[in-house]
Design a protein with these regions (language model features):
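A short, conserved alpha-helix within the catalytic core of class I
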Residues: 6-22
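Core SAM-dependent methyltransferase catalytic element
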Residues: 75-97
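Conserved Class I S-adenosyl-L-methionine
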Residues: 42-66
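S-adenosylmethionine
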Residues: 36-40, 44, 74
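Residues lining the SAM
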Residues: 1-4, 32
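Conserved beta-strand signature within the Rossmann-like core of class I S-adenosyl-L-methionine
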Residues: 23-38
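Short histidine/acidic/glycine/proline-rich micro-motifs that form metal-
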Residues: 6, 36-38, 59
Length: 97
C-alpha cells in the first residue's frame, strides 16, 4: 500500500482494522512510502513533501513509524520488517499474529 500519506488517518486506521479482520495468520500487510521515524534524521525532501501534502489537505502527511507500530499492536499485527528504498522511502511489513 502506498496511500497512507495521501489519505486521512481514519483511512490508515481502517486499513489496519481491515487487515486484522481479513488476513490469515502470518500474512503480510505491506506499506511503502515516506515516513517519519523517531531518532532518525528526516531527509529535507521528505520534510518538504510532508509540508506540501498538509498544505493541500490538513488530514494528509507523512506518518510516524512509531504510531503505525502502536496501531498495528492494537489490531493484532506486528512489524516484521523494515527495508530502506530509493528516494528516502521505506517498506514496512506488518504481519497478523
Amino acid at each position: 500500500m502506498n496511500m497512507i500519506h495521501i489519505s486521512p488517518i481514519a483511512a490508515t486506521e481502517g486499513l489496519f482494522a481491515g487487515a486484522a479482520r481479513t488476513l490469515a495468520s502470518g500474512a503480510p500487510l505491506i506499506l511503502y512510502g515516506p515516513f517519519f521515524e523517531e531518532d532518525t534524521v528526516t531527509a529535507p525532501s521528505n520534510i518538504a513533501f510532508d509540508e506540501s501534502l498538509r498544505e493541500r489537505n490538513s488530514e494528509w502527511g507523512l506518518r510516524q513509524v512509531g504510531w503505525l507500530d502502536a496501531l498495528a499492536g492494537k489490531t493484532g499485527l506486528s512489524r516484521s520488517a523494515r527495508h530502506e528504498m530509493p528516494a528516502n522511502n521505506l517498506v514496512l511489513v506488518y504481519r497478523k499474529g
